[in-house]
């Protein structure tokens, strides 16, 4: 409840203050249950925009975000999956195991940014191989 409310309120305030707006289309194409969503990451707003539209989102995120007071604690409380980007193969195995465990407990919608970080619109893509491994190992759409 709290993340969905916070997300909707933040997006509404951003629209009112900055005069932006958002147009969400294609929600009817999302499957039921667990699945992988791999969008481009272009701003902070990308991370919160999905909460109102997914049943139980599960983010894979950089470990450093868990160090932010209160925010980091809440990330862990929501059972998101922090990744240590220093050791790629070890980190990937840990992420696959943690994601598999979370999806076995409850159908969750995995959100992972396949480039690993924010990139400006129009920048050349730099996709990481982890998304392919997750898709193969988890067996979800």
What does each of the following model-derived ranges do?
Residues 16-141:
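Soluble catalytic domains of membrane acyltransferases
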Residues 1-19:
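N-terminal membrane-anchoring alpha-helices
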């Amino acid at each position: 409840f709290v993340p969905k409310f916070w997300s909707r309120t933040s997006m509404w305030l951003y629209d009112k203050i900055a005069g932006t707006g958002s147009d969400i289309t294609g929600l009817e194409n999302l499957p039921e249950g667990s699945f992988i969503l791999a969008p481009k990451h272009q701003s902070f707003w990308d991370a919160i925009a999905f909460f109102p539209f997914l049943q139980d989102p599960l983010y894979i995120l950089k470990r450093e975000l868990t160090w932010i007071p209160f925010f980091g604690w809440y990330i862990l409380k929501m059972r998101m999956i922090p990744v240590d980007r220093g050791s790629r193969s070890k980190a990937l195995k840990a992420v696959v195991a943690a994601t598999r465990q979370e999806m076995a407990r409850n159908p969750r919608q995995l959100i992972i940014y396949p480039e690993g970080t924010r990139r400006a619109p129009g920048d050349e893509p730099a996709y990481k191989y982890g998304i392919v491994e997750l898709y193969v190992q988890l067996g979800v759409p």
